[in-house]
Amino acid sequence: MTRKFLHTSDLARAVGVHPNTVRKYADWGLNPPVERTPSGYRLFTQQHLDCMRLARLIYSAPYPGRGFRALGNEIVQHAVMYDWQGALEKAHEYLAIVRAELQNAEGAADLLEHWVQNMVSISGNESPLAIGEVSKLLGVSIDVIRNAERNGLITVPRNTYNNYRLFGKREIERLRIIRMLGKAGYSHMAILRMFLELDKGNIRDLKKTLDTPRPDEDIFTAADRWLTTLRAQETMARQVIELINEITAS
């Protein structure tokens, strides 16, 4: 039976991109090798269109970091090698990782509310600690603590005699929440945004504040709205699984 070939323009129309983008996907290895006519025209097949649809779906989502892009690349490469079962397995792995990250991020944001309530009852009568002592207590480097201070996440009082930092209970607890939110994937900008509201006495909707850039934040990353990013990744992963199942069923 004669194979049905598709032209560059056919793929471009099917996925809604410029023809040059189709050529780039082939050059970048996001499509299987492409046959050419004696005159040099590319001859695509349904396999190329399927891979193009898959790659467009994966790469159209915001880049979240934390190894997601590498796993997305693996899904595409399995498809390029005609290994749709391998692509499906990797897609399910992707979805499981995203859901675990989302659960972790949601849990950290929920713990934030509990922390805020406890902060109200914290007294400042304990003997302050030096930065090295805080580093050992929290299991973070001194540079991490200094970086939090430089980025405005914490203000640390100083000894009037030697200018050494003095970390009281409030500062230490604030560093704990910075560490927790950072490990959960939230950016320094998101944490700072939350603290700015908290320091003004606004203790409601801090979870929403973590996920909502202010109007003056002209440039922001995926981690500046981490919950939204992860939910978008979850949706994308489910769509990838549906697409692969559709392709293999046809």
Regions found by a protein language model. Give the residues of each.
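Arg/Lys-rich, alpha-helical DNA-contact motif
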Residues: 2-15, 27-38, 42-127, 169-250
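Residues within the helices of the helix-turn-helix
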Residues: 8-9, 23, 132, 146
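Short alpha-helical "recognition helix" segments of helix-turn-helix
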Residues: 11-12, 134-136, 148, 191
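Major-groove DNA-recognition helix of helix-turn-helix-type DNA-binding domains
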Residues: 19-38, 141-162
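Short helix-capping and hinge/turn segments at secondary-structure transitions, especially at repeat
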Residues: 136-143, 150-159, 172, 180-187
